[in-house]
Design a protein with these regions (language model features):
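Glycine-rich, flexible loop/turn motifs
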Residues: 3, 41, 74
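C-terminal structural segments of small proteins and small subunits
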Residues: 50-80
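Short, flexible active-site loop motifs that bind/organize anionic cofactors or intermediates
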Residues: 2, 46, 64
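N-terminal first-folded block
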Residues: 1-27
Length: 80
């Protein structure tokens, strides 16, 4: 699945709530999201207007690995 090109950090954080993540803190221009599904896991997302595709792909890969999904499966759950 092709990744969205104009996704903001806040929109991405909202999408990650669909798979059990929640914002635990925000410091400056970064948000930290945490889930306890399958063990505690943290990801840090820049709160920028538009996330770079490589940044988005890296975070998706990290989350997908933790959840035991492929990156494409996770992208479909979040963006479809």
């Amino acid at each position: 699945m092709k990744l969205p090109r104009d996704l903001s950090g806040a929109e991405f954080a909202r999408a990650l709530t669909k798979v059990g993540y929640r914002v635990t803190r925000q410091t400056g221009s970064h948000m930290r999201l945490t889930t306890s599904d399958g063990g505690e896991h943290h990801v840090t997302i820049p709160a920028h207007e538009s996330l770079r595709v490589g940044t988005l792909a890296g975070i998706l890969g990290d989350v997908a690995e933790h959840l035991g999904l492929t990156r494409d499966e996770l992208a479909r759950r979040l963006f479809d």
